[in-house]
């Protein structure tokens, strides 16, 4: 039995802190709290109306995936992780993560509701995990792991792959729109959400390091390569990023690069041994995600929750 999963009679009380590294992650998550009302999407409609049909199609499908995916992550937290993990510090993080995932889901739903006026199309997008095969494939993979009989360690890797791999390509595509000066509300919310998800992925890696009996390297590699294949298909075949003017081969390589960063953070050898295909994408890769958070994306962080020097993070890099 893993110590972090063993029955803990002190789980109802926070102090004294036993796992300071896990507690520090919780405090970072707490400092990142934001709400959808703080994101101004009023200027997006003008840009939306200027987009090509291909660009609109791409953005709608990405938002449809995101709108459902956060609910899947939350179902896993509620049904499995929050019940299994017995240490208070991790439960604090997971509880806060659930609140943040709700905000993400609300944000994506609001964006769809704002951009798409036809009620039938809205319903189609809101029900993407049933109506869109390309989204359903990703959703089915994630949901499979909620109910899988595998141990906590394997499922921890699977959901690190969901948040670290399934999300990264879509984040990159929205950052590409920011580079073009489009959709300020969408792109600002993307900065906040990608920061949050980076922290969630970092937390999964931290929890993995607390396991005394982690899954084998072979098992970890299998889960991650499976996720990479699904995501590559999603963004280069089912919903090709060429629709918004990005290079599909570069996106494929980027997904492999992200996977290498993730497995390296977990303490294993890289799988693909590729370099980052673009300086632009360096800003949103997994490495340094916690630092990315600390630099206060969009100059946003709760005052006084964490003491940090002011840093200015720029995404204005040639792609």
Swiss-Prot record:
Residues at the active site: 108
Q: Name any cofactors this protein relies on.
A: Fe cation
Note accompanying the cofactor annotation: Binds 2 iron ions per subunit.
* Region described as Interaction with R1: spans on this chain: 313-319
* E.C. number(s) listed in UniProt: 1.17.4.1
Q: Which domain of life is it from?
A: Viruses
Q: Which GO terms describe its molecular function?
A: metal ion binding; ribonucleoside-diphosphate reductase activity, thioredoxin disulfide as acceptor
Q: Describe the reaction catalysed, as an equation.
A: a 2'-deoxyribonucleoside 5'-diphosphate + [thioredoxin]-disulfide + H2O = a ribonucleoside 5'-diphosphate + [thioredoxin]-dithiol
Name the job this protein performs. Ribonucleoside-diphosphate reductase holoenzyme provides the precursors necessary for viral DNA synthesis. Allows virus growth in non-dividing cells. Catalyzes the biosynthesis of deoxyribonucleotides from the corresponding ribonucleotides.
Which family, according to UniProt?
Answer: Belongs to the ribonucleoside diphosphate reductase small chain family.
- Subunit details for this protein? Interacts with RNR1/OPG080 subunit. Can interact with host RNR1 supunit.
What protein is this chain from?
A: Ribonucleoside-diphosphate reductase small chain
Organism of provenance: Variola virus (isolate Human/India/Ind3/1967) (VARV)
Gene that encodes the chain: OPG048
